[in-house]
Amino acid sequence: MLKKGIKKLLLVAMLLTCNMAAWADDEVFSYEGDHYVINVEALHPDSEMTLMDVLLVCPNFVTYDGRNIVGKYELCVDNVSHIMDIESFTQNVKASELKEIHIYNFGSVSQGSNGQYGVIDVYYNTPAAPGTSGKVAIEGSTYGNGKLYTDVTTSSENVVVKGYALTSLKYGKATTDEVDYFRSRRVVENAHFSLKWDISPKDNLMIKANQKFYNYKEHSHIIEDDKMYNIPVYERYGNFVAKYSRILNDNGAEFCAEACGDYLNLHEGELKIRDTYPYCYAEFHFPLFTEDLQMMVGWEIDYDNYWVIDYNRQQYLENQFYMQLNYSHGPWNITIGDRFNHFNHWSHSFNPGDDEFRTSNSKNINCFQTSVGYKVNRHLIQGSFSHDFYLPTADETYLDISAFERRRFYPKTNTIWNTEAMYTYQHKNIVSTSSVYYSWRDDSYLPEEQKVGFRTSLTWNAGAFRLTAGADYYHVNLKIVGLEDKIYNNCINLKLAPTLLLGHGFRVSSVMLYNNKQSLSLLPSHLFASVKVNKDFGKHLNVYADFRDIAGMPSFTILNLQENYYNRALTIGMTYRF
């Protein structure tokens, strides 16, 4: 018996060694100047690994609750904004469907993200053969919550058509020190259509259309005021995108152009908002003197017509010209770029007597970005820097109805500096990253913010067992207009995500996310934790149970209740593939 046991252990060790050797040449991360790429296939995903599981591998913390992407990142698919219910989308899109994910933390020039926001750009695998495939997912959980999700992909030799549809219903109730009665209902409906057509070996046309409906009703009783509050929210959003690209020659020269139109209709209590936002851009990519030096040149025009009915109307017209150079030779990768923006802004009050609040401004601003990377074998060192002037978004200012006194000075360009030094080590089935970063931000009347921090992450894949862990520690210094004293905060975020593949189609996974402060307003710490068990029944059906909880749920504001109490739930669902 002892000899048989030793033989089994040796056999398992040999199999693990073979796996590690087979993965030796796979690199999960590759760096391309202003962004890094997650090569999803190099993660060797199992059939139930989701898009959110892949995003947990990111060195940056892209989620704090295991469900949604943090607000500083915009989700795109094929470099086009993707307007879907994030929670439903990230948990139902499987990693095996994806080719790669581009993460832009310094995308001010190429993506126009102005230093405040990053971009998560998802690319799907090309269908291996013409045909139709898809899946249907349904789930239900406590509080009467439920979701229905479906996606279908149809492909021929030159055309790929993909469609999504989902509906999500959430109920909630809670009691806190400030609120003795709180009930809410949220309904989300999404529909998405995309078409990719290879007109010729050098020409491609992509068309996308999105529709989103959101309805939210809240009933609460505030103890201090002894009042009942009813806050209905209604939102409808539409989006249409057309994108054309053409390969100009065999040296890598390419031209692409995109046109888009967005429409928003929002009712929040007595507040009514209308927003139309068309834009278009044209972009060239080509080698300059040598194939090692690639150049990108582009022009973009945006128009935003934003109405707060009965209060204010503001309009933007922006012309942007941008250029970026990327030099890649041997172990070196150097990127430098600049985006110049000339914008015109008009603000009009609906009250004829408020002439002092009518403004018209014209300004020139620019964003600068550079990075240097050096790679030797499995080691990579990269430094990135960006200096941006950005504009506050419309809703940051004009939804604050009491801020008329500040609006007469609006808009004022704001400054943000970002810099980061990062080290990455990739070997066989282990990926490790560490970075030091610093940012400085100043705006018209909100806090001046300085942040310095250190983050590290590790991903280990041993075949049947996968582990992702990370930590992010940073110090924040705030200087608020009107306050003599500065606000100092030391914050830490931790993540741990193990996955175990068992026999007979069982999969057990867990996600734990901790942060000692949910915001700089000293809200208490919390720990999000989930345990999920999947079971395959044949090749088409998967059934799962998922329990989620939050320890240390805050009770300071209703807003935090809205965002957090949904987690305390047991979810049972199934996915059928066809």
Where are these regions (language model features)?
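Short strand-turn segments of transmembrane beta-barrel domains in outer membranes
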Residues: 127-154, 179-184
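Signature of Gram-negative outer-membrane beta-barrel scaffolds
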Residues: 292-376, 380, 391-392
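Flexible loop and strand-edge segments within Gram-negative outer membrane beta-barrel domains
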Residues: 170-190, 196-279, 403-404
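Gram-negative outer-membrane beta-barrel transporters
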Residues: 331, 426-518
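Short acidic/polar hinge/loop motifs at secondary-structure boundaries
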Residues: 80-107, 150
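C-terminal beta-signal and adjacent terminal beta-strands/loops
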Residues: 23-24, 533-578
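Outer-membrane beta-barrel signature, preferentially recognizing the C-terminal barrel domain
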Residues: 230-247, 356-375, 379-461, 487-490, ...
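N-terminal periplasmic accessory domains that precede
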Residues: 51-54, 88-89, 103, 113-137, ...
